[in-house]
Amino acid sequence: MLKLYGFPVSNYTNMVELALLEKGLPFEYVLTFPEQTPEFLARSPRGKVPFLGTPQGFINETDAILDYLEDIGPARRLLPEDPQARATVRGLMKEIELYIDLPARSCFAEAFFGGSVSAAIKSKAREDLLAGFATLKRHARFAPYVAGETFTLADIVFLYSVD
């Protein structure tokens, strides 16, 4: 059985969990927090979550996990089979991650954890986020889903990066 290692506040863990649920793949959720111990690093080389336990070993990094799930659970596709459409969805996923999620993270310390963020960092984040959403507006279809008429991995990434 697959084992998803992560914790509920991690948007990346939540992306993998939703993909597992959408694909109808049985899995065990193992509440896990990042560590830097040798034992943990043997399963997750950067000491991060999520990572996925499979019968063959461990897979780390969300993109790699999502690709694996797509390959082992073909009954419910979350990426188009057509190469052009698949590349478009992958491009949207990367745009959301790099140009929306990543800039927003620079303000997480203040937004979620009681820390403070300088005005310069907030200003840069705002500028980058506006550019990121402008990019998404030009590229995404939202008809009704991010990439068009079908729910895909781009919708999962959007949900946990924007909501």
Predicted features along the sequence, with ranges:
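GST superfamily/GST-like fold recognition
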Residues: A104, V146-D163
